[in-house]
A protein has these predicted regions:
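Cell-envelope/extracellular polymer assembly enzymes that use nucleotide-activated donors
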Residues: 5-7, 165
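Short, well-formed alpha-helical segments that are part of the catalytic scaffolds
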Residues: 9-28
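Acidic helix N-cap motif at the loop->helix transition within catalytic regions
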Residues: 17-21, 41-50
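A conserved acidic beta->alpha catalytic loop
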Residues: 36-44, 89
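Conserved donor nucleotide-binding strand/loop of the catalytic core
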Residues: 44-77
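Conserved catalytic loops of nucleotide-sugar-dependent glycosyltransferases that act on lipid-linked
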Residues: 66-67, 117-219
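Conserved donor NDP-sugar-binding/catalytic core segment of glycosyltransferases
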Residues: 97-119
Length: 220
């Protein structure tokens, strides 16, 4: 069997409880690339027992940097499509089928749409982006990209925008974006957003930056 044209990028930091199951769960959809962000709980060692490609940071660089590392690797290694998902097991991965479908049909960017969100600030962000741009869940960890969209901008997320910066630029430039429903379950382990107060501050900052980029489409 030849190499897949789909790379599935999974950022992981201290996800030993779920990483093996997640890696095995998604490998039927494409080649799995796991970016270990200097975990200390054995995540890396568990990844080495799977068929996934392991990319490792030498220090803890954060969620956005992990996604950027994986996506850059996928593009440099000539994968046509890149799908991101989280390592915590929260996202039910049969939702990847919808992402793959839209990518294969020619969509440049596909955004997952979760059936529930954990925080009111996430609900607010989604409400605002839906009202203005008809995108309901910009913070969903499952997204799909044609590699050409990365090449167009040359970066993924340089502003620590929880993986939404490339989406914001795509909205600004009227890139065709498709949403697909994703089912979630209660996550295991610590949230990528941190505690309730820190997540409120972090997401509020992202909302400000996101609209600062994307809303230029409306005022140009």
């Amino acid at each position: 069997m030849g190499r897949s044209d789909i790379a599935i990028v999974i950022p992981a930091f201290n996800e030993a409880e779920t990483i093996y199951e997640v890696a095995c769960d998604v490998e039927k959809y494409g080649d799995v690339l796991i970016v270990d962000d200097y975990s200390t709980d054995g995540t890396r060692e568990l990844v080495e027992t799977t068929r996934a490609t392991l990319l490792s940071h030498k220090s803890n660089l954060g969620y956005e940097a992990s996604l950027s590392t994986g996506i850059k690797y996928a593009v440099e290694n000539d994968y046509r499509y890149i799908i991101t998902t989280d390592a915590d097991g929260e996202l039910i991965h049969f939702g990847i089928e919808g992402v793959v479908k839209f990518l294969k049909e020619g969509c440049l960017l596909v955004v997952g749409k979760r059936n529930k969100k954990n925080r009111m600030i996430e609900v607010l962000f989604g409400f605002l982006t839906f009202c203005v741009f008809r995108i309901q869940d910009p913070l969903c960890g499952m997204k799909g990209y044609n590699a050409d969209i990365y090449r167009k901008y040359g970066f993924f997320d340089n502003r620590k925008m929880i993986g939404t910066e490339l989406l914001a630029y795509s909205i600004r430039d009227n890139v065709a974006i498709q949403e697909t429903p994703i089912t979630v379950i209660k996550r295991k382990g610590e949230s990528r957003f941190g505690g309730s107060f820190s997540s409120f501050i972090k997401i509020s900052r992202v909302i400000f930056l996101f609209f600062g980029i994307a809303f230029k489409r409306k005022t140009a």
